[in-house]
């Protein structure tokens, strides 16, 4: 008997998560330098100075365990978003929170609903806990909420919605989400994943935290990896009613967020200038991508995130490989069932120009 046969049956069915290729790996493989990475939707402006100072002040305390409750950071989040600290759960990135939600509310035989082309961690965690995935066919690359409602049955425990969606960038309005939540049975938990919400225009942004007052079955997760620039520290938070947050505290690891992440997150949380700089660059440069695609006849999915997904109308793997040889890393998404597409993170203007120039060369665009 092999160890695979000994493993949890859900784990037996899994394939490892494929992250964006690291710059160092490409340097080793091809021996090239001056590489740009437009693969993982990271903040192109680097690590915020406010977070650097906070980390420096924590270095002498690293022999001590972090505050398991994250009291100070929770207080800062509560103040910024007009919440109660008891509503907040901290996570080692929002991925940690997605897993925490699934482990808390679903088990073998239960059903979890999510969309086709949604964040790949949803099906991964569903398999890992031996739950049944109800993957709803996408509508115009996004969530078909009416089909979600039709799929609900007595076994449904959890619904995942990403807004904006990754990797397609589709966006649901507040009215659409409100109407949907009003029709979901109140015992079914709805997890609204808002990792990219800071990149949507302020006038379009969903006031999801206000919806918590109407829908006690709603859990909203946020990431500090994207607009806030803390991807390497792994920090995110979820907001829910206090009863649900209390359940999360029964399941989460006792020290799931490290001291440096706690300090950096608290510092950058109110660094509005840094976040707005990233959002403004994204708005401007995303428009350049759209104009580039329109000029050269490339099809793309309109995006509200800090990325754009381009349809090359043929298998995209050769384009991806050719871009690597040009020193440009983007994200293949065949694992999402989109083999003809590449997802490209919005970078700095000069990085985006390198990507444009590389595509013109590779595709012989005229």
UniProtKB/Swiss-Prot annotation:
BP GO annotations: L-histidine biosynthetic process
InterPro entries, per the entry: Aminotransferase_I/II_large (IPR004839), HisP_aminotrans (IPR005861), HistidinolP_aminotransfase (IPR050106), NHTrfase_class1_PyrdxlP-BS (IPR004838), PyrdxlP-dep_Trfase (IPR015424), PyrdxlP-dep_Trfase_major (IPR015421), PyrdxlP-dep_Trfase_small (IPR015422)
UniProt entry keywords in alphabetical sequence: Amino-acid biosynthesis, Aminotransferase, Histidine biosynthesis, Pyridoxal phosphate, Transferase
CC cofactor: pyridoxal 5'-phosphate
Record's keyword annotation contains Transferase: yes
Chain positions found as N6-(pyridoxal phosphate)lysine: 226
Catalyses which reaction(s): L-histidinol phosphate + 2-oxoglutarate = 3-(imidazol-4-yl)-2-oxopropyl phosphate + L-glutamate
EC number of the protein: 2.6.1.9
GO MF: histidinol-phosphate transaminase activity; pyridoxal phosphate binding
HAMAP family: HisC_aminotrans_2
Subunit structure: Homodimer.
Entry's family note: Belongs to the class-II pyridoxal-phosphate-dependent aminotransferase family. Histidinol-phosphate aminotransferase subfamily.
Name of this protein: Histidinol-phosphate aminotransferase 1
Organism annotation: Mannheimia succiniciproducens (strain KCTC 0769BP / MBEL55E)
């Amino acid at each position: 008997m092999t160890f695979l046969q000994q493993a949890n049956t859900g784990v037996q069915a899994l394939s490892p998560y494929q992250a964006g290729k690291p710059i160092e790996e490409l340097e080793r493989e091809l021996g090239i330098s001056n590489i740009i990475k437009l693969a993982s939707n990271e903040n192109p402006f680097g690590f915020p100075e406010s977070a650097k100072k906070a980390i420096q002040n924590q270095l002498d305390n690293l022999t001590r365990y972090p505050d398991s409750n994250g009291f100070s950071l929770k207080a800062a989040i509560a103040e910024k978003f007009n919440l109660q600290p008891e509503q907040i759960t901290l996570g080692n990135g929002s991925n940690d929170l997605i897993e925490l939600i699934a482990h808390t509310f679903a088990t073998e035989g239960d059903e979890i609903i999510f969309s086709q082309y949604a964040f790949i961690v949803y099906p991964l965690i569903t398999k890992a806990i031996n739950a049944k995935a109800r993957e709803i066919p996408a509508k115009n690359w996004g969530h078909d909420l009416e089909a979600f409602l039709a799929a609900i049955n007595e076994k449904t425990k959890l619904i995942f919605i990403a807004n904006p969606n990754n990797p397609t960038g589709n966006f649901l309005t507040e009215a659409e989400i409100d109407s949907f939540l009003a029709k979901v049975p109140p015992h079914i938990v709805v997890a609204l994943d808002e990792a990219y919400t800071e990149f949507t225009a302020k006038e379009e942004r969903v006031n999801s935290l206000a919806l918590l007052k109407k829908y006690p079955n709603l859990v909203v997760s946020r990431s500090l990896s994207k607009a806030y620039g803390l991807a390497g520290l792994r920090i995110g938070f979820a907001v829910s009613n206090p009863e649900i947050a209390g359940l999360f505290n029964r399941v989460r690891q006792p020290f799931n967020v490290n001291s440096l992440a706690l300090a950096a997150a608290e510092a950058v949380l109110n660094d509005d200038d840094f976040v707005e700089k990233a959002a403004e660059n994204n708005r401007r440069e995303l428009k350049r991508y759209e104009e580039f695609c329109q000029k050269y006849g490339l099809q793309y999915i309109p995006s509200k995130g800090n990325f754009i997904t381009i349809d090359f109308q043929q298998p995209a793997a050769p384009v991806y490989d050719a871009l690597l040889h040009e020193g440009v890393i983007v994200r293949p998404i065949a694992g999402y069932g989109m083999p003809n597409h590449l997802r490209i993170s919005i970078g700095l203007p000069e990085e985006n120009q390198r990507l444009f120039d590389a595509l013109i060369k590779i595709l012989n665009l005229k």
